């Protein structure tokens, strides 16, 4: 009975170990794009197609490399690491911004991590405030209930007045419509004779 229990645990561990091995075959896409642009050295900037060719020829990349490169280019444009010389979005020509992109990208990542940490810390501070508020909530709920009870008769009165108006207006319209029909019938009858 003891032998089958430890067997599934080692089977699960190699699956977890495989995931980090895959990205180790090549550097990050942002680093590869920077290397491709540096290698191109064209005045007009390097196109996405040339970047893709360089990355595929120099690195072991998966099937979805083109899509990853496109996404990475967009990210680098938004962070200001790349400058677009021609075109719009991920299509066009690109240059590295002033200074090496490789130096800037880790700094950008650190800033993002710091920003993420800062965003989490105010949330923690807000949680104890929420814990205090439930004592106030029942009073507020009681006030809301009173307001609703006061407001509800007003709402009930309004539809009654609307119905009364609609009935009054509808009656004369019917009477007016019936009269012209009678006249039209009288006019038509002499023509038939």
From Swiss-Prot:
The cellular component terms of Gene Ontology attached to this UniProt record, alphabetical and capped at eight, are: nucleosome; nucleus
Q: Which SMART domains match?
A: H15
Q: Which residue ranges are recorded for the region named Disordered?
A: 1-29, 80-193
Q: Which InterPro entries match?
A: H1/H5 (IPR005819), Histone_H1/H5_H15 (IPR005818), WH-like_DNA-bd_sf (IPR036388), WH_DNA-bd_sf (IPR036390)
- The question of whether DNA-binding is a record keyword is answered with yes
Compositional bias ranges of the Basic residues kind: 13-24, 104-193
According to its UniProt record, in which tissues is this protein expressed? Answer: Erythroid cells.
UniProt protein name: Histone H5
Species this chain originates from: Anser anser anser
Provide any one GO MF term from the record: double-stranded DNA binding
Function according to Swiss-Prot or TrEMBL: Histone H5 performs the same function as H1, being necessary for the condensation of nucleosome chains into higher order structures, and replaces histone H1 in certain cells.
Pro residues bias: start-end ranges: 1-11
List localization entries. Answer: Nucleus; Chromosome
């Amino acid at each position: 009975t003891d032998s089958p229990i430890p067997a599934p645990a080692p089977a699960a561990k190699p699956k977890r170990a495989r995931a980090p091995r895959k990205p180790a075959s090549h550097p990050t896409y942002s680093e590869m794009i920077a290397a491709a642009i540096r290698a191109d050295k064209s005045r007009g900037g390097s196109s996405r197609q040339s970047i893709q060719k360089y990355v595929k020829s120099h690195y072991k990349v998966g099937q979805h490399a083109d899509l990853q490169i496109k996404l990475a280019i967009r990210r680098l444009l938004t962070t200001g690491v790349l400058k677009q010389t021609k075109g719009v979005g991920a299509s066009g020509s690109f240059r590295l911004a002033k200074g090496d992109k490789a130096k800037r990208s880790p700094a950008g990542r650190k800033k993002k991590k710091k920003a993420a940490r800062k965003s989490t810390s105010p949330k923690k501070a807000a949680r104890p405030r929420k814990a205090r508020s439930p004592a106030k909530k029942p009073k507020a709920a009681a006030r809301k209930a009173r307001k609703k009870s006061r407001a509800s008769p007003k709402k009930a009165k309004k539809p009654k007045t609307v119905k009364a108006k609609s009935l009054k207006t509808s009656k004369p319209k019917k009477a007016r419509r019936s009269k012209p029909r009678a006249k039209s019938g009288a006019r038509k009858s002499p023509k038939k004779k």
